[in-house]
């Protein structure tokens, strides 16, 4: 069945791409195709080979996380499934159009229509960062040998004014909770390795109580907790910490993650398999726009999120466009 779209939660503010994205230049030399691993006993040689790839260099975040060391040890994502729920994805982009790149049961359309090109841009960019093809063209993702299980949902957009969600016993979140629990359960039932959630409600987790969060999202918490599984077998859920720093001039407190990213701070059964991700610049310092780990420091990681080059959905036959985005989604 086509999943029922959730009632427009406010996503993390989508960044604006740099002007007029252009197709990536053809690299000067051919490299091993997607899925190929250089078999060698020489770790340094393998690491150097990956680092010399034009695709590796184009995605500047790879060097910061030392991805080449993982690749040289054979950790390329093979055998894993990454789950992404976003407003749409361009499955025909050259970074995502591999024969088995998207699972056949991915949900690429809404219940009533297909996503527009604009609606597919954020999810396309995020997906290619995670697992874009290593095919001697453009850039490649962190786990380039992984598969993608994608769910398209309608999302609202963050406005110029920061608007913290009202979450307490006076607000009925039953419909939202029903939808989110159903959607997140698709990932759990699929046995997805890790799920990226680049959306959520604005508002510092410090401003909410455990009681209010449990009252609003009981079914979603139950699904995310996966109480019937050992910790090592659970699907991991990674949430954008939020871009509250971009609203600092409005007096916004971005010292801790927003609602979804901060869930494990308040909900103990989510601490083994849920975490927030903050953004750092390429020099390793935290990005000015990013929420901080704060009270959720024990359930929080950092990743490059400033000016990250990745796939860009475009209404053009080439499907080979790229752009830079910034944000904790990246």
Name what the model sees in each region.
Residues 102-104, 150-152, 239, 276-278, ...:
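Structural signal for conserved beta-strand scaffold positions within catalytic alpha/beta enzyme cores
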Residues 31, 71, 76-77, 133, ...:
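Substrate-binding/access-modulating region of protease and related hydrolase catalytic domains
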Residues 100, 143-146, 152, 199, ...:
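Short, small-residue-rich loop/turn micro-motifs
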Residues 86, 258-330:
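Extracellular S/T/G-rich loop segment that most often corresponds to the catalytic His/Ser-adjacent loop
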Residues 1-36, 40:
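Ser/Thr/Gly/Pro-rich low-complexity, disordered linker/stalk segments of secreted
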Residues 137, 246, 306:
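Glycine-centered loop/turn positions within well-structured domains
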Residues 103-113, 313, 317-320:
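Glycine/charged-rich beta-loop-alpha catalytic/anionic-binding loops adjacent to active sites
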Residues 25-50, 54-59, 68-104, 111-175, ...:
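Subtilisin-like serine protease catalytic core
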